[in-house]
């Protein structure tokens, strides 16, 4: 087994799908290496033959290729190497990649105006490396199948809940005057809308899949792999985000609940700013601009008290009004009756 390549590196690495001239759609893997002779190892597996190829790039080769393209100073060389290490984590940023005289050549942007082309040479694939790469691919495909299946289960549950809501709304709409006419106008029989209103089963999905065409074609396989790999990356990003959120919960600023400062009638009980800054009240000088407003508030409060006393002094009016309400009760409109059919 090549001591430079380890199984853990393959399992943790980021696979991507690229179209390579002469090989068609391929799975690619870029690995940073800590070997004194190799800084980058590239694994290429054709989807047609499932035969792995390995390409290597040394520090000396990288320096010579950069110098031949005009990057001679050490600052530029270090910048290109750092950018190359970033590309290994996000191989989708590679502009072009292809086979040229058995070498794997790829290019990437160092800046908006500068592009660097790198030429990696083929390396012998030992028997142990061959099986290690294929084993890693099998584990990757199993994980993608499991992720796709779990995603399908969650999506099916969501669609079932939405179908129940749609059925309830249809029943409620048919129960209203003119509701059936609205449905028939929007979704007449044998129309696309009418078909969308019907419940969909697994058999219906399989029939649509069969009528879709040659879904087992190589292009469809490559597109499916791209979709699943993208879904896996999103899942990992969300998982890392939630884990970091759980770790940072203790460091977040917690605001007090509304009921801490307000009672059930939403009347202010305590000023939170004054509690936080007990000595700030003496530093604030009152402004004369707000005096008329305080008089207005006192006058309005006095009027409210007078109105309240008048309402207490006229109980007969309230009694007569309540009797009128009892004599002429309001009619309630029945709406949205649901029919249950056995």
From Swiss-Prot:
Disordered: region residues: 270-342
GO MF terms, alphabetically ordered: DNA end binding
Outcome recorded upon mutating residue 161 to Q: In strain: DBVPG1135, DBVPG1373, DBVPG1378, DBVPG1788, DBVPG1794, DBVPG1853, DBVPG3051, DBVPG6763, DBVPG6765 and SK1
CC terms in the record's Gene Ontology section: cytoplasm; DNA ligase IV complex; nuclear membrane; nucleus; site of double-strand break
Effect of residue 105 to A: In strain: YPS128
Bias kind Polar residues: ranges: 297-312
Keyword Cytoplasm attached: yes
Renumbered residue ranges of the record's region Interaction with LIF1: 173-342
Outcome (variant: residue 281 to C): In strain: DBVPG1135, DBVPG1373, DBVPG1378, DBVPG1788, DBVPG1794, DBVPG1853, DBVPG3051, DBVPG6763, DBVPG6765 and SK1
Protein name per the record: Non-homologous end-joining protein 1
């Amino acid at each position: 087994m090549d001591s430079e390549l380890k199984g853990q590196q393959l399992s943790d690495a980021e696979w991507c799908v690229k179209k390579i001239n002469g090989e068609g759609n391929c799975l690619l893997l870029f690995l940073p290496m800590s070997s004194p002779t190799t800084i980058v190892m590239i694994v290429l597996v054709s989807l047609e033959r499932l035969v792995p190829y390995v390409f290597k790039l040394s520090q000396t080769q990288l320096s010579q290729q950069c110098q031949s393209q005009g990057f001679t100073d050490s600052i530029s060389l270090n910048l290109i190497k750092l950018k190359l290490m970033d590309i290994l984590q996000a191989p989708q940023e590679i502009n072009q990649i292809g086979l040229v005289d058995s070498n794997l050549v790829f290019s990437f942007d160092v800046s908006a105006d500068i592009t660097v082309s790198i030429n990696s040479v083929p390396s012998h694939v030992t028997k142990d490396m061959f099986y290690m790469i294929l084993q890693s691919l099998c584990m990757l495909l199993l994980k993608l199948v499991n992720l796709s299946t779990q995603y399908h289960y969650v999506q099916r549950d969501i669609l079932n809940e939405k179908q129940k809501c749609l059925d309830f709304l249809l029943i409620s709409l048919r129960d209203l005057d003119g509701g059936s006419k609205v449905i028939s106008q929007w979704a007449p029989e044998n129309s696309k809308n009418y078909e969308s209103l019907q419940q969909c089963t697994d058999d219906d999905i399989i029939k649509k899949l069969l009528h879709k065409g040659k879904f087992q074609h190589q292009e469809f396989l490559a597109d499916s792999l791209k979709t699943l790999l993208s879904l896996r990356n999103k899942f990992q990003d969300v998982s890392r985000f939630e884990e970091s959120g759980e770790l940072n919960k203790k460091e977040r600023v917690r605001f007090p609940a509304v009921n801490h400062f307000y009672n059930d009638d939403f009347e202010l009980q305590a000023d939170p700013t004054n509690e936080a800054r007990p000595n700030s009240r003496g530093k604030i000088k009152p402004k004369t601009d707000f005096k008329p407003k305080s008089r207005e508030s006192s006058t309005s409060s006095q009027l409210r008290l007078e109105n309240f006393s008048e309402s207490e002094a006229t109980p007969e009016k309230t009694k007569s009004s309540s009797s009128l309400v009892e004599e002429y009760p309001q009619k309630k409109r029945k709406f949205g009756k649901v029919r249950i059919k056995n």
